[in-house]
Amino acid sequence: MSAVPRIDGHDRMAQVPPAVWQVNDLLSSDDADPSEVHARLLALSDDDLAHYGLRSYRMNLMALLGEHMAPEAVLRLAREAAISKLWLGWEYHHHYLSKLDVTPPPPRLQRLPVDAVKGLLARGRGAIIATFHLGYMRDIPSDLAHAGIPIMVPLARDAYGNYESARLDRPEAALWTCFRHVCVEEAAGSLALARHLARGGCVLSTIDGNTGLDGPRGGDRRSVVNMLGTEARVKNGLIAMAARFGAPIIPVVATTVDGERVCHVFPVADPGRPLTGDEATDFVEATVHGLYRVLAETLLHAAGEWCGGDLFHQWRLPRGIDEEPLSVAEARLASVLDRHGRAVLDLSRVMPLTSRGERVFVDVHSMKCYRLPEDEGEFADLLQDAGRGITRDWLDGLGTARRASVWRFLCVLASRGGLSLLHDASLSAA
């Protein structure tokens, strides 16, 4: 058993299942029937969804929510989030955006804050709408643009390309009268954003994209925030721009409520005037923390719509491991097994990176990975099976060398809080 130095957010598997090929064909089409696309996505197995980042969703959502809900609920939300990203991305870009024309369509969102945004813009200092890669975030700027509010949307390079293709394909669409998109991974885009705000314009940003000129992994202009006990280093450049120009910031998210697309509007953070020095720094830090508090609280009831959750590990900080002495962990483990108990993975802490039988496990808090040898399939299965688990009888049936290796691995996991010890029909975390 060995540690894996790092994990990759997206899995590139050698063999792609037929269901994935079929879904990929549908997702590349503007003419596919929405009901068929949705049904095909729901029918994907967890192994199929591993090709679309399910492993990362599981790890990241478990790190955030594992102390707030049962592991089974988190795994369900991770699956929903992976499907939501595929479904809502296709539905917007291939079914909605590609069919717009000269007549603005009715708004897709309920409780769209048109009057609130107009009121902020009337102050003459511009305005920023801060949202997240969550739910119907794409509908917020397009609905506002169709309502006659000129809006600029900063995007990463790939997302920018999606909108630019749509604009070139249907330049006559009413959307483009008030909707402008810029790539903030290029200097011209960032400059255009600053000029737009300086002139009193409106900007909408999905701030958890956490990208800029240095890309999503760059270290420039970052603040450390706490989300449900997990720290993350997030971009603050747009908030600093708001402080510089005195632009108020209104947080808005759009999620599903009783089957409807509904906006939720949160209190405005208003610098009141252009700020400099310590005043600007204090405003930026307070506002960034407040915005990510909004995201964290929203995830408690809408994590299944967080399409950005598969990239959270790029900007969250690993938690330190409270590791007890190996001898203490070994004694506790031996005590439970000697009394006919069993040991299994604590799935709120350590989980397989894919479905049963996977040989790699990850500590969702520290992001430390463990790899089992290819011939340890039975061991991997037992670790994940609460009904069987690892027992003294199973260990005693192993050869001497293999038993020693397995035992040490179990003791290490126990010392790092990665095992649950079951005995006398009770459960205790080790």
Where are these regions (language model features)?
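Membrane-anchoring hydrophobic helices of lipid-metabolizing enzymes
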Residues: 2-131, 136-137, 141-142, 166-172, ...
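Active-site glycine- and acidic-residue-rich loops that bind
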Residues: 178-190
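Short, surface-exposed basic-aromatic patches at helix termini and helix-loop junctions that form
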Residues: 142-149
